């Protein structure tokens, strides 16, 4: 059973950095969602741009429908960034050839093969250790730009098909506190249970082929799926006081050649009276070497939730996989985040 635990903690970095392109998206979203002019302007006053805001862009942003306080904040940003380099031009997108979808028979075969793979996934994994790095971000304004709350390093051991987590440090400081007692949002189920539950017969998920995609250089089938609430085992626990098991939907990526699952996305259909109004998860798998053998193992999970206007985002990376053994050691220095290209989907190729 995959469980999300939501315990909101209000700790936020003082200043947000963003590019002009990110600023454009932020303003567009703010206008569409009718955020108060005062709130948007206040947020921009705590924002530092990474490149120059040009006069033509300033005029473009005004034309979007920015309020007078936001316009004044944008003018201040234009003055403050006049010595910064201009943003690089957006790359030109070239449309590739249209790739026909597989036949209905092939689509059915792919799902059946993926189901067999998912049901036997945990049994096929070796005993191992790895480092789990969780970077947690929050946005109490609800405007969509996050400040980092903390970085949690944990030792994750997988032995006899069971996961065990031990927190090693928080923000580089050694601690001996269980994950569930750290507060904030946490998640579990990356090592097989999320995937298996989706394909369980009693879950009765409906799968529909959607499109092709390229992920980490390989072509994937992308299916959309739907799980009705009565068949769901996916749970959200709110502050250990309330719990809900909603229906959910999302996408599942299946590598064309190996028929292994490489990504699962999930969006919960949460009852309107539950404190957490939105919950989304994306889980990526990649081929990883353990003791000279390749295994498809979790690479990164991203969890997003919303309570009222409070937004939470967790980025969970799984690093330094090692074969489980009495003499196995891992250095728990926090690595640099994975590059965006590690989980970036690209247009389908031939």
Where are these regions (language model features)?
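Short hydrophobic/aromatic-rich motifs at helix boundaries and adjacent loops
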Residues: 1, 28-32, 182
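Sec-dependent N-terminal signal peptides
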Residues: 2-12
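Short, solvent-exposed linear motifs at loop/edge-of-secondary-structure regions
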Residues: 6, 52-59, 63-65, 215, ...
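General marker for long, soluble alpha-helical cores
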Residues: 14-94
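Structured extracytoplasmic
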Residues: 86-248, 256-262, 267-280, 286-300, ...
């Amino acid at each position: 059973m995959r469980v999300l635990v939501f315990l909101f903690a209000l700790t936020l970095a003082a200043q947000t950095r963003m590019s002009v392109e990110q600023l454009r998206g932020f303003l567009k979203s703010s206008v569409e969602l009718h955020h108060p002019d005062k709130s948007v302007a206040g947020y921009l006053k705590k924002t530092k741009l990474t490149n120059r805001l040009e006069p033509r862009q300033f005029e473009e942003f005004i034309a979007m429908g920015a309020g007078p306080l936001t316009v004044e904040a944008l003018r201040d940003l234009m003055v403050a960034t006049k010595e910064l380099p201009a943003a690089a031009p957006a790359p030109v997108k070239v449309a590739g050839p249209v790739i026909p979808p597989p036949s209905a028979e092939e689509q059915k075969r792919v799902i059946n093969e993926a189901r067999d793979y998912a049901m036997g996934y945990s049994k096929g994994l070796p005993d191992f250790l790895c480092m789990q790095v969780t970077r947690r971000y929050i946005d109490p304004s609800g405007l969509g730009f996050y400040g980092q709350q903390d970085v949690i390093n944990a030792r994750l051991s997988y032995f006899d098909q069971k996961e065990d987590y031990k927190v090693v440090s928080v923000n580089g400081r050694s601690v001996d506190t269980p994950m569930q007692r750290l507060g904030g949002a946490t998640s579990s189920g990356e090592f097989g249970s999320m995937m298996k539950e989706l394909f369980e017969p009693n879950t009765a998920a409906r799968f529909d082929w959607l499109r092709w995609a390229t992920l980490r250089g390989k072509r994937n089938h992308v299916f959309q799926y739907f799980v009705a609430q009565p068949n769901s085992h996916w749970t959200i626990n709110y502050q250990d006081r309330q719990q809900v098991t909603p229906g959910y939907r999302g996408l599942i990526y299946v590598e064309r050649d190996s028929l292994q699952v490489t990504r699962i996305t999930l969006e919960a259909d949460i009852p309107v009276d539950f404190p957490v109004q939105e919950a989304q998860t994306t889980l990526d798998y990649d081929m990883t070497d353990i003791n000279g053998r390749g295994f498809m193992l979790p690479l990164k999970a991203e969890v997003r939730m919303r309570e009222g206007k409070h937004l939470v985002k967790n980025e969970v990376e799984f690093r330094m996989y090692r074969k489980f053994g009495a003499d196995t050691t891992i250095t728990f220095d926090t690595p640099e985040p994975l590059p965006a290209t590690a989980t970036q989907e690209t247009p389908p190729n031939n």
